[in-house]
């Protein structure tokens, strides 16, 4: 009987280790890097790739600061995306629509649209970007 209990306990422990954790806390400085923005390498940006370190995640969550003159170039979406403007000003576009954006606004981009966003003005454009993954990331 005690062998069965030990086997069951070991199996439960292995299952817990293979599953995604209940919570992950990520320090922004640990995931910060300067790089050209995606989709065209237009200018420079500072990327905070928060969700990259999260095992078993189902979504991306990032902060990107577009330096003066930088842009995330036009690209067709395979999912919905939300961009939240933390600071600065920019111009978002989707299909044939263009709109100015500023701090405190969110832009909801839809699956199948071709979209992008560019920094405008004297200050960098700081964004939070979130979207679902097509396939859940592997648990580590």
List each language-model region with its residue ranges.
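Conserved short histidine dyad/triad with adjacent acidic residue
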Residues: 60-77
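Short beta-strand segments in beta-sandwich/barrel cores
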Residues: 70-72, 88-93
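Ligand-binding loop in jelly-roll beta-barrel domains
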Residues: 56, 111-136
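Short acidic-glycine-tyrosine-enriched beta hairpin
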Residues: 97-112
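Glycine- and acidic-residue-biased ligand/ion/polar-headgroup-sensing regions
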Residues: 78-90
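Sec-dependent signal peptide recognition
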Residues: 1-8
């Amino acid at each position: 009987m005690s062998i069965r209990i030990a086997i069951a306990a070991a199996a439960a422990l292995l299952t817990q280790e293979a599953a995604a954790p209940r919570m992950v806390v990520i320090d922004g400085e640990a995931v910060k890097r300067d790089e050209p923005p995606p989709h065209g390498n237009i200018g420079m940006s500072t990327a905070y790739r928060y969700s990259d370190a999260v095992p078993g995640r189902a979504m991306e969550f990032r902060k990107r600061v577009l330096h003066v003159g930088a842009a995330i170039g036009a690209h067709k979406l395979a999912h919905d995306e939300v961009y939240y403007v933390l600071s600065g000003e920019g111009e978002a576009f989707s299909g044939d629509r263009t709109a100015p954006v500023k701090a405190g606004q969110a832009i909801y981009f839809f699956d199948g649209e071709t979209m992008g966003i560019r920094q405008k003005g004297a200050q960098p454009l700081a964004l939070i970007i979130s979207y679902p993954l097509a396939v859940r990331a592997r648990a580590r």
